[in-house]
Amino acid sequence: MELKFNFEYRGESHFGKIYRPYARVLLKSPKQELWLNEWLIVDTGADFTTLPRYIARELDIDLKGDCMNGSTSGVGGKQVIFLLKKYLEVKLGETTRRIPVAFFDNNQVPGLMGRQGFIETFDTEFLKAHVVVFKS
């Protein structure tokens, strides 16, 4: 399998044009036969996949009952997160994985595709043509 996604142009900054590597991922609800289509930033700096709070609601995940409280630190400082107790089934193209997932306590941070159980299970390339490539 080889799957390619173009980076998304996000505007300009003092340093020039900003492009972000996004990938289309399907997320399966653990409680019903529902697949949610989401675009996640491919973030090699993220230890694990972390999603905005609203996605938990759409997947019928109860942040109090289905998750454990945790915290994470990054460029924006320390944040409260909810760690899903069970792995979540996801699809990238036709490839299915079961991955660890956490949810932010807000909707301000976009979904981040992390390394653990996901990015690290593919040969992943970031091309200078602003394309991210996943190979299995």
Where are the predicted features?
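Pepsin/retropepsin-fold aspartyl endopeptidases
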Residues: 1-136
